């Protein structure tokens, strides 16, 4: 594959010189398109952690789940719910013939792309919240795009954190990372309690409406990438940016070897976990967590979460719905997967500070999720065509060595 890419680059260099000699313009992104990859940078946004708001929010979530009959799509993506609890990973895309800019959460835990309508109603849920909070990261006005198609279908999605969005299904041109895909289906949301739009890139089987080609599938079908696969590099907790590469992998961003683990679900990006080493204790954790870029914290069943918390001396607080912990957790927590794959994470990644108090970044939930506090220390390649997720220990570097998948 490398030799093919090198040959292609040489041909393109020759072509570029030929075009310049004739006074013609060189097409934008000619090199990127030749390598069949789309590199999309994250913008990292941080908000102070608020334990009181977390507790009130999750208690409200539990009440809503008891009252509502509609099944949730997934556990709420904390960054896209009403309370951001850590770094939020979003990317800028454009929608429409006039390239209306949107900044959307990149979410491996859901599968739908939806954006906020220019006339949307933002559902205010707590005192002091701006009535336009959902429009601050860009909006979409269908009538201003000559390529917009209203499909006349209703869209509704609800997350387990109680947040929800409703609107109408459209097709239009979507631009991301220098690539442009035409007739992409997505939702134009007119009512939402979520902070901003979401770019869901999971399996199509997890979509909120009858199966359609979501963004990664369309990228492949329109020949922009070779396969429905992408690699995720969130970068360090203090970094201002990260990258997702559709159709490619950055071999400079990990140490050791990438090992492919079978995806254990037909509609969610889950892999087999076996044990967790923490503070000299080995905790049995035979479960299949979702590797979810749209969730800040890590979640396990109460049995597993209690054992992890006990190992670091953290105590459950029912009001905050979190474990209170020391602000100075030392050492590492090591996640042991199938095939001998291990990912080591400093326990400092699992400390949430609110004033002088600190909380453990693992909490209880019926859904098992490895969120951003895990993913920042892993380099992950999601191969949805091959039904695998490959993992390796991350390497923080500005160097890059991208190859196609």
UniProtKB/Swiss-Prot annotation:
GO terms for molecular function: aspartic-type endopeptidase activity. Belongs to the peptidase A1 family. Induction: Expressed in greater amounts in the mature biofilms compared to early biofilms during inflammatory disorder of the palatal mucosa among denture wearers. PROSITE patterns: ASP_PROTEASE, PEPTIDASE_A1. Its EC number is 3.4.23.24. One of its GO terms (cellular component) is fungal-type cell wall. This is Secreted aspartic protease 8. Secreted aspartic peptidases (SAPs) are a group of ten acidic hydrolases considered as key virulence factors. These enzymes supply the fungus with nutrient amino acids as well as are able to degrade the selected host's proteins involved in the immune defense. Moreover, acts toward human hemoglobin though limited proteolysis to generate a variety of antimicrobial hemocidins, enabling to compete with the other microorganisms of the same physiological niche using the microbicidal peptides generated from the host protein. Plays a key role in defense against host by cleaving histatin-5 (Hst 5), a peptide from human saliva that carries out fungicidal activity. The cleavage rate decreases in an order of SAP2 > SAP9 > SAP3 > SAP7 > SAP4 > SAP1 > SAP8. The hydrolysis of Hst 5 by SAP8 causes production of the DSHAKRHHGY, HHSHRGY and FHEKHHSHRGY peptides. Monomer. Keywords: Aspartyl protease, Cleavage on pair of basic residues, Disulfide bond, Hydrolase, Protease, Secreted, Signal, Virulence, Zymogen. Residues 24-75 form a propeptide. Optimum pH is 2.5 using casein-resorufin as substrate, and 6.0-7.0, the pH of the saliva, for cleavage of Hst 5. The keyword Disulfide bond applies. Its main location: secreted. Transmembrane segments: none annotated. Residues 58-70 have a biased composition (Low complexity). Pfam families: Asp. It catalyses: Preferential cleavage at the carboxyl of hydrophobic amino acids, but fails to cleave 15-Leu-|-Tyr-16, 16-Tyr-|-Leu-17 and 24-Phe-|-Phe-25 of insulin B chain. Activates trypsinogen, and degrades keratin. Residues 89-392 form the Peptidase A1 domain. GO terms for biological process: fungal-type cell wall organization; proteolysis. The gene is SAP8. Disulfide bonds join 122-134, 327-358. Pepstatin A binds at residues 107-109, 160-161, 292-296. Residues 1-23 form the signal peptide. The active site is at 107, 292. It comes from the Eukaryota.
């Amino acid at each position: 594959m490398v030799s093919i890419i090198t040959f292609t680059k040489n041909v393109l260099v020759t072509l570029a010189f030929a075009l310049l000699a004739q006074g013609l313009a060189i097409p934008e992104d000619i090199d990127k398109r030749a390598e069949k990859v789309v590199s999309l940078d994250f913008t990292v946004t941080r908000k102070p952690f608020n334990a009181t708001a977390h507790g009130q929010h999750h208690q409200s979530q539990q009440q809503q789940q008891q009252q509502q009959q509609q099944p949730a799509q997934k556990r709420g993506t904390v960054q896209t719910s009403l309370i951001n609890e850590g770094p939020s990973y979003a990317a800028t895309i454009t929608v429409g013939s006039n390239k209306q800019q949107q900044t959307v959460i990149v979410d491996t835990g859901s599968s739908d792309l939806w954006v906020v309508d220019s006339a949307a109603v933002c559902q205010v849920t707590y005192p002091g919240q701006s009535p336009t909070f959902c429009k601050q990261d860009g909006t979409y006005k269908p009538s201003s795009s000559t390529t917009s198609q209203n499909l006349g279908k209703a869209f509704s999605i609800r997350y387990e954190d109680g947040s929800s969005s409703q609107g109408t299904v459209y097709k239009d041109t979507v631009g991301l990372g220098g690539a442009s895909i035409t007739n992409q289906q997505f939702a134009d949301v007119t009512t939402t309690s979520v902070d901003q739009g979401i770019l869901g890139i999971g399996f199509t089987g997890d979509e909120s409406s009858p199966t359609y080609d979501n963004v990664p599938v369309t990228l492949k079908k329109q020949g922009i990438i070779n396969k429905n696969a992408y690699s995720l590099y969130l970068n360090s907790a203090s970094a201002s940016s990260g990258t997702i590469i559709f159709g490619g992998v950055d071999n400079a961003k990990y140490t050791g070897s990438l090992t492919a683990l079978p995806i254990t679900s037909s509609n969610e990006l889950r892999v087999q976990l076996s044990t967790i080493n923490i503070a000299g204790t080995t905790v049995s954790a035979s479960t299949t967590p979702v590797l979810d870029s749209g969730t800040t914290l890590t979640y396990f069943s109460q049995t597993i979460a209690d054992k992890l918390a006990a190992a670091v001396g953290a105590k459950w607080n029912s009001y905050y719905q979190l474990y209170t912990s020391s602000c100075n957790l030392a050492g590492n927590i090591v996640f042991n997967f199938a095939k001998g794959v291990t990912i080591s994470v400093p326990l400092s990644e699992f400390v949430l500070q609110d004033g002088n108090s600190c909380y453990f970044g693992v909490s209880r939930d019926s859904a098992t999720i490895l969120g951003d506090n895990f993913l920042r220390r892993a380099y992950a390649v999601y191969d949805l065509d091959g039904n695998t997720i490959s993992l390796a220990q991350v390497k923080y570097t500005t160097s890059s060595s991208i190859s196609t998948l």
